[in-house]
Amino acid sequence: TVCHKCATPCPVDIDFGDVSMAIRDVLRRLGNQSPNPAKSAAMFFLNTNDPGTIKLTRKLMIDWGYKAQRLGHRTLGKLGSAQTRRPPATTGGRPPVREQVIHFINKKMPGGLPKKTARALLDVEDRNYVPIIRDPAGTTSDSEAVFYFPGCGSERLFSQVGLATQAMLWHAGVQTVLPPGYLCCGYPQRGAGQFDQAEKIITDNRVLFHRVANTLNYLDIKTVVVSCGTCHDQLLGYEFDQIFPGSRILDIHEFLLEKGIRLEHATGARYMYHEPCHSPMKTHDSLTVVNALLAAGTNGRIEKNDRCCGESGTFAVARPDIATQVRFRKQREMEQGAGKLRGDGFSGEVKVLTSCPSCLQGLSRYDDDAGTGADYIVVEMARHLLGPAWLESYVQRANAGGIERVLV
């Protein structure tokens, strides 16, 4: 795996995440990598940056594909109950196709996702223009500007995450500069062992970002905002301090904490926090940030819910049999965590919050088992600070004169 969890306790200081990626790259170049249609489809979705292709692929994979998986879960879910109660061993290679299919549908995919990507909703898909998003009534051309890199998960898949980040930056009174067009950071390609593709993406992105920085040097950008941990990890190698001199990379939640933006009222829900393997919060302790943002004194202290969610990018579709084993342990943690929050007779909503798009998908699979609801921290904040119709309101206001498009 590429979670890098082995690196910390390893007595000889070997990062087996890096080793795994290197082995995959060698096997691919030698032509010995096992074919996996589901993984190939996912990588195709991440590699393309053509708006039309993304729209079609999203329709087929996310809209129809997720619906088909949920239908399979409803129809054949009982066949998977034995797997989730006691996962079978995975030694000896892959299980038969029939078992793999049951592993794939034993926990349902999330539903109710936005019908379009964040860029499509804001009409900023043209890669020849850099969008600058600002509140015309609350900002000027001299207001603080940040560069927001949404990444694939927050932009193409869970577009509500990217939009919530933009809405909260709008609320904070800053100008938000988006990259021109759909971009991937390159981490998924490295994780899949496609080192040559990853290097091409990284090089192209860095050249593009230098052009953006030269074009918008009057904005004096000092902060690069991210909403995804793997994007954060990958962007650390982009040398942004040479692109935007003196800049730093900061997670959206840490940025909001620094701006003093947090909930001040009771939400009626209780929370636990799932920390991703690739945590985007690297400046402050993640649990401290979550408790500060969500008013722990009013809504109750938020505890960490341990164990991997079992999604891990393409892991759950590439090896659903192993993902079933990982989920078995996580489900116990989820049920115990939710039970603790309900221990005093609390009958309201229990939510598990995270800061990773892939984990958001993985955690939503436990909704029925643990009686929880999975969501993103910044989405929960937008809902309670900006109102239940925050997404529609933000899109409407941004499209009504809040977007400047600069040719790059």
How would you name each of these model-derived features?
Residues 17-408:
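Iron-sulfur cluster-binding electron-transfer modules in prokaryotic oxidoreductases
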